[in-house]
């Protein structure tokens, strides 16, 4: 059975992680993340909480991968973007 190659990425403000893995055709997003070793390397990644995507498009852990996909693990937001914009606008008025 032919293999597919995918990249798994996770970015922090101070460091980015990029792993290339080979998987069998029919593998899922979750399979790629587990094969990348990032879950062991970064225990702060919780697949129950962190959203995932392929090329900035949100996907589910069970979605099947294609050759050349880039699986992205997103960090949870620590602040509401709308509220941050409001605060910056108020500061700019001063």
From Swiss-Prot:
PANTHER family noted in UniProt: UPF0125 PROTEIN RATB
Taxonomy, superkingdom: Bacteria
Descriptive protein name: UPF0125 protein YPO1103/y3077/YP_1053
Family: Belongs to the UPF0125 (RnfH) family.
InterPro entries membership: Mopterin_synth/thiamin_S_b, RnfH, RnfH_sf
SUPFAM superfamilies membership: MoaD/ThiS (SSF54285)
A Pfam entry, by short name: Ub-RnfH
